[in-house]
Amino acid sequence: MFNKSQTLAKVDIEIHQAITQEKVRQEAHIELIASENYTSPAVMEAQGSQLTNKYAEGYPRKRYYGGCEYVDTVEQLAIDRAKVLFGADYANVQPHSGSQANAAVFQALLVPGDTILGMSLVHGGHLTHGAAPSFSGKNFNAIQYGLNEKTGEINYEQVEALVKKHKPKMIIAGFSAYSRVVDWQYFREIADTAGAYLMVDMAHVAGLVVTGEYPSPVAIADVTTTTTHKTLRGPRGGLILAKANEAIEKKLNSAIFPGIQGGPLMHVIAAKAVSFKEAMSDEYKVYQKQVKINAQVMANIFIERGFDVVSGGTDDHLFLVSFIDQRLTGKAVDAALDSAYITVNMNVVPNDPQSPFVTSGIRVGTPAVTTRGFNEADCADLAMWMCDICADLENEAMIDQVREKVTSLCVKHPVYN
């Protein structure tokens, strides 16, 4: 029998200390990594519940284990809410991550060796869209499209040419570092000309899609995948959505279980369900609108200060800054900003002369700071401080001054009040 008085602090002081330190870091540092956000206390409560104890292989009312009546309720709520939230006919809430959601789609619709067309990793795509180190690049004939060098936007002419030349079995639209609106309908039409499946990975913009701040691909693509964190602001996990197609739905379910996963994480699925309910609120609509406004404010400041923002701005929650002209590396900028308690990630940019371990750019995103309550004025100040540092990376006094300002701003806007 477990004694509830045996808290983490008593049982494992090392882990308790690390978690405590991370809590302090999250409160004291400004988080600008585009794929990160803060979940609500309700989401964390669900994820920390006794549901972690329950094995439930299969799907609601079709389990291979007994005692699933209550987790069936939880998973069905998550499924129903996801379908309503995104206007989907089908939803699978079991993927442990966005990458596993993507892997399941590949397993469901393709066979090894099939040709796929996805966005190049160095131009803003994701590892699972055909990058060489990924299963998607190793097991399939992966062809990559990129950006127009002049505009920094997707090169749709190149997409069309590659489709005609390679006749892919599946086209992947979506990104991990792209700041403009993707023309989902164009991808649908070009996929139809090749008789290809269209898969959209909307992991980065799912929250914006929910509230209409970014166009929805769900009714356009054959299958849409997403993570449940990032802009969606739920727990870390994956989600597969689709329009009605019984054959594809069966393949997707089988690809997740028993294809690539065993028992679902019922505590995480409960947390997903909670976050989906939160995303139906009026407050959530206000939040997503502010996410985009804040990103645009920050991008404009960087442009005004003479830095190269890829594509010249943003239509979503993120933007890329290229420091090729300044001969700075993303790694150095990342480190300098981190010293000022501002967290970003170095990122490859178009025509980057540096390796992916060094890069010439950074990716900046506003979901987390907007959750804290940052408004346009806060984000304008923050962008100015960042530009000050980027203009003089070796100025330790400048970094110290910015760190003090960051500390004051974080006290003004706590993550958890």
Swiss-Prot record:
Keyword Protein transport: no
GO CC terms in record: cytosol
Keyword field: Amino-acid biosynthesis, Cytoplasm, One-carbon metabolism, Pyridoxal phosphate, Transferase
EC number(s) on file: 2.1.2.1
Zinc as UniProt keyword: no
UniProt cofactor(s): pyridoxal 5'-phosphate
Listed InterPro entries: PyrdxlP-dep_Trfase, PyrdxlP-dep_Trfase_major, PyrdxlP-dep_Trfase_small, Ser_HO-MeTrfase, Ser_HO-MeTrfase-like, Ser_HO-MeTrfase_PLP_BS, SHMT-like_dom
N6-(pyridoxal phosphate)lysine PTM sites in chain numbering: 230
Alphabetical list of Pfam families matching this protein: SHMT
Protein location: Cytoplasm
Catalytic activity from the UniProt record: (6R)-5,10-methylene-5,6,7,8-tetrahydrofolate + glycine + H2O = (6S)-5,6,7,8-tetrahydrofolate + L-serine
Positions bound to (6S)-5,6,7,8-tetrahydrofolate: 121, 125-127, 355-357
Site annotation Plays an important role in substrate specificity: residues: 229
Pathway annotation: One-carbon metabolism; tetrahydrofolate interconversion; Amino-acid biosynthesis; glycine biosynthesis; glycine from L-serine: step 1/1
Listed GO biological process terms: glycine biosynthetic process from serine; tetrahydrofolate interconversion
An MF annotation (GO) of this entry: pyridoxal phosphate binding
Enzyme class at the top of the EC tree: transferase
Function noted in UniProt: Catalyzes the reversible interconversion of serine and glycine with tetrahydrofolate (THF) serving as the one-carbon carrier. This reaction serves as the major source of one-carbon groups required for the biosynthesis of purines, thymidylate, methionine, and other important biomolecules. Also exhibits THF-independent aldolase activity toward beta-hydroxyamino acids, producing glycine and aldehydes, via a retro-aldol mechanism.
Family: Belongs to the SHMT family.
Classification via NCBIfam families: PRK00011.1
Subunit structure: Homodimer.
Record's protein name: Serine hydroxymethyltransferase
